[in-house]
Amino acid sequence: MALLIAVASYGQTAKQVLDKAAAAVSNKSGITASFTLKGGQMNDKGSISIKGKKFQIKTSNVIIWFDGKTQWSYVRKNDEVNVSTPNESQLQALNPCNFIYMYKKGYNSTMAKKGGNYEVHLTSTDKKKSVQEMYILIHPQTYIPSEIRIKHSKGWNTIEVSNVKKANLSDEIFHFNSKDFPTAEVIDLR
């Protein structure tokens, strides 16, 4: 009952809020943001650039490029690049903004108010999915997500998102350029 009142007071459904968040984050020319990842053994800070389904993630440990099909992961300490073609669950684990696509199929959604923001709760309809549950805090005026909490088989991860800006991103930044890493060993896992 309280959830129905909360949703009614917004005048929007969880899906409508997620549609607006997806539109805000999937700017055709691209966006950039900073993030902090916390949970389990994965604690790191970094930046992300997104353009459609393409992304580039930079942290102190790795740089990941994804051009919509191929992924390159550069591991700094090993000076190596792993090349792969990730599946849906691997992409969900890597890209904090992947909820843009995943909420449309295979998830039930509800919404409540938390600290003046929309809090959308997604639960998987398929017990085999790698992401079983997710909470997304969304700003009510900009529809930009500020926090994403994801439940994996090993527990919860929290991604805090900040400094989200529209950007005119070249497709080149979503590809690994071997000239920038001349000593890196390239390992093709495809």
Stretches found by the model and what they are:
Residues 50-53, 65-67, 134-147:
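A short, surface-exposed beta-strand/turn
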Residues 34-37, 56-60, 119-127, 147-151:
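Short beta-strand segments that buttress and anchor functional surface loops
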